[in-house]
Amino acid sequence: MKQMKKIIFAFAILMVLSLTGCGKGKTPKEEIYVYNWGEYIDPQILKDFQKGTGIKVNYDTYASNEDLYIKMTQSQDKYDVVVPSDYMIERLIKEGLVREIDFSKIPNFANVEDILKNPSFDPENKYSVPYFWGTVGIIYNKAEVKDKVDSWNILWNEKYKNQIIMYNSQRDTLGVALKRLGYSLNSTNEKELQEAKKSLIEQKALVYAYLDDDGRDVVVQGDANLSVMYSGDALLMMQQNEDLDYVVPKEGSNIWYDSMVIPKNAQNVEGAEKFINYMLEKEVQAKNVKHCVGYTSPVKGVKELLPDEIKNSKVAYPDMDKLPPLESFKDLGDFIKVYDRIWTEINASNL
C-alpha cells in the first residue's frame, strides 16, 4: 500500500535500537513492543523516546493490515502499540482485540485536530489515536493530460489508453468505481457492485497496468500519465517530477487514517500510553512528517514547523471545507466475501 516494508529500513531501526542499548552496560528498566508499517517512523524518534523515558522500544514492521491481523490473532507475539488503518481498527474493536485507552494518560490528545476526532470507525474515540492521515485521488502529468482533471471519469477516457494506472487492490479499485457511479465505497448492494465490476472490466482495455507501490516510479518517469494515488505518495512524486499534480475527484473519495491502538493483551499498558502521548508532541510529529514526506500530521500547529514545500502543499494540508465528500473504509464483515468474488471475476475477465 502506501508504506512498503524495506529491509534496509528495518536494519536501520535495529541499529538505532541496539546502539541506544549500549554504553556503560545499562539496561532499560522497561520495554514496549511496537508494531507499525514499514518506513513509517524516523528511527531517531525511537532513540529519543528511550533516552527520555528509559523505556526500550522493540520495533517491528508489517506490510498490510491483513498481516497485522494475522499476527495479532495467530501469533504468540504480544505488542503494546500497533498502528492499523480505519477499517481494521473497526474490526479489531468488534472482535475485542484492542482495549479502551485511558485518555487521562494521553494529555497530548488535546493537540489532535478536532475534525479527526470521533472517526466513523471509532465514533466515541475510545480506542484509537491518529498517527497519520490522507486522501486518495488522481495524480497526473499536466504536460501530457490537457483535459481538466476533476472527475474519476478521466480514468475511463479512451484518449488516455495505456496511460492509466489502477491500484492492484480490491477495496481501493472497487472504491474508485463505486464513487464514480455515485455510490458509497463501502457499498453492500450487490447491484451497485455489479455495476462497478462492469465498468472496471470495460476500463481494462485502457489500463497500462494494475500496480502497487511500483506504480509511483512509472508515473514519475513518464511511462504513464494518470494514476490513482495516495496523497502521501503523490506529494513525494510531485517533488520528483514538477509536471505532476494531484486532485481529489468531485464525486468524492477515500479519506484514510492510520491510528495507534493498544492490543487487549498488551504487556506494558503504561509504557504504551507514554509512547502514544510522546508521538503526539508537536516537535516529534514535525520530525516524523519530515522523515515520511507526504503524510499528514493529525496534530495542531505541526504545519508551521515544516519546510515550505510541505506546509504550503494542498496535497498534504488541503482546505477541508473545499474537499468533495470523503469517507473512510469500513469493515464489511462477512460481506467482504462478495468483494473477493467480484474482484476475482474482474481479474479473470477477458475483453
Q: What function would you assign to each model-found segment?
A:
Residues M320-L351:
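Conserved C-terminal helix/tail region of periplasmic/extracytoplasmic solute-binding proteins
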Residues G23-R91:
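Early extracytoplasmic/lumenal segment of secretory-pathway proteins
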Residues Y35, K78-D223:
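Extracytoplasmic ligand-binding site segments that recognize negatively charged/polar headgroups
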Residues I93-E100, D122-K126, M237-V248, E309-S313:
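Ligand-binding "clamshell"
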Residues M88-R91, V220, N225-D243, C292:
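A ligand-binding cleft/hinge motif common to bilobed small-molecule-binding domains
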